[in-house]
């Protein structure tokens, strides 16, 4: 589980689209005929400590398993998430949100994200204000019934409050210290609606 508080921003260093499946402790992670990409991500030094193979980490809100580490580079093998999330659209040089899963006893309060993405949505509008940035996001039609004002939603791994809803669009407000500078109109984001996962 994750708190929805991004701990750092990584950079995609390499994408191997012809990757072979890897194993941890002799156990295959994926079926041998699975479509697979390996993503190498440069981690910030302050969150790299203690990262080991087998650890669960959220990348843009998607729960992935570390398969290899080499200095500042952490590798993930990605299978189903290529089609179900935005990870299949990443390019070398892209920025990604990173959060380690919390350990037993670390969680305070009832908020959490599972790292299982509910759908992919589109950023349709940015509104710059004095103390925050307002973002309007267009959700897939089949998820609109689960959108509720003043409830929480995960957007690329960031736990945020839905401030307003218009049809299948919803609005979130970002504090200035929330670093999402590389997002723009037209960007696609992973969303997780905790209500569907039973987290509300």
Curated annotation (Swiss-Prot):
Claim: Cytoplasm is one of the keywords in the record: yes
GO MF, one example: riboflavin synthase activity
Locations listed in the record: Cytoplasm
Key words of the record: Cytoplasm, Luminescence, Repeat
InterPro entries attached to this UniProt entry: ATP_synth_asu-like_sf, Lumazine-bd, Lumazine-bd_dom, Riboflavin_synthase-like_b-brl
Major place of residence: cytoplasm
A matching Pfam family: Lum_binding
Lumazine-binding repeat ranges, renumbered to this chain: 1-111, 112-200
Source organism, top-level taxon: Bacteria
SUPFAM superfamilies tied to this protein: Riboflavin synthase domain-like
Cited Gene3D superfamilies: 2.40.30.20
GO process terms (BP): bioluminescence; riboflavin biosynthetic process
A GO cellular-component term linked to this record: cytoplasm
Subunit-structure text: Monomer.
Job description of the protein: Blue fluorescence protein (BFP) that can bind 6,7-dimethyl-8-ribityllumazine, riboflavin, and 6-methyl-7-oxo-8-ribityllumazine as a bound fluorophore. Has no riboflavin-synthase activity.
Name used for this protein in its record: Blue fluorescence protein
Gene name per UniProt: Y1-BFP
